Curated annotation (Swiss-Prot):
Regions that span the bilayer: none
Gene encoding the protein: fosA
Protein name: Glutathione transferase FosA
Signal peptide positions on this chain: none
Organism: Pseudomonas aeruginosa (strain ATCC 15692 / DSM 22644 / CIP 104116 / JCM 14847 / LMG 12228 / 1C / PRS 101 / PAO1)
Example of a GO biological process term: response to antibiotic
Length: 135
C-alpha cells in the first residue's frame, strides 16, 4: 500500500545553477551532491536533481509542483524571487495566494498559501463546472 510521495526527481541541464536556485532562493538544504546529481530536502520533501545535459525542458502543459508557504511569508518570498529575476508563468486565479514561477530549467513551480481543506471549502462556495464532492 502506498504511503505518500517518496521523492521528486527533476531533470536539469545545469546542476550548479539548479542547486543554487533550490538552496539559495527556495531554502532547500543540500544533503549530498555528485557529478550527475544532488539530493536536497525541504521539510519532508526529498528532491533529487538529475543532470541531463541535453534536457529540453518540461512539457508545455499545466503540470506543476506546488510548495506550501505561510501567509505571513508569502509577500516577502514572492518579492525576493521577483528581485532575483525569477520568471513567472501564470497569474493566480484560485483560492489562496499563489506565486507561479519557473526554475532555471523551466519546471513550473508554485508557492501556495493554503491546503486541500481550504481549497475544498472555497470550491463548496463556488464549485468548478461539473464538480462533485466525495462526502
Amino acid at each position: 500500500m502506498l504511503t505518500g510521495l517518496n521523492h521528486l526527481t527533476l531533470a536539469v541541464a545545469d546542476l550548479p545553477a539548479s542547486i543554487a536556485f533550490y538552496r539559495d532562493l527556495l531554502g532547500f538544504r543540500l544533503e549530498a551532491r555528485w557529478d550527475q546529481g544532488a539530493y536536497l530536502e525541504l521539510g519532508s520533501l526529498w528532491l533529487c536533481l538529475s543532470r541531463e545535459p541535453q534536457y529540453g525542458g518540461p512539457a508545455a502543459d499545466y503540470t506543476h509542483y506546488a510548495f506550501g508557504i505561510a501567509a505571513a511569508d508569502f509577500a516577502r518570498f514572492a518579492a525576493q524571487l521577483r528581485a532575483h529575476g525569477v520568471r513567472e508563468w501564470k497569474q493566480n486565479r484560485s483560492e489562496g495566494d499563489s506565486f507561479y514561477f519557473l526554475d532555471p530549467d523551466g519546471h513550473r513551480l508554485e508557492a501556495h498559501v493554503g491546503d486541500l481543506r481550504s481549497r475544498l471549502a472555497a470550491c463548496r462556495q463556488a464549485p468548478y463546472a461539473g464538480m462533485r464532492f466525495a462526502d
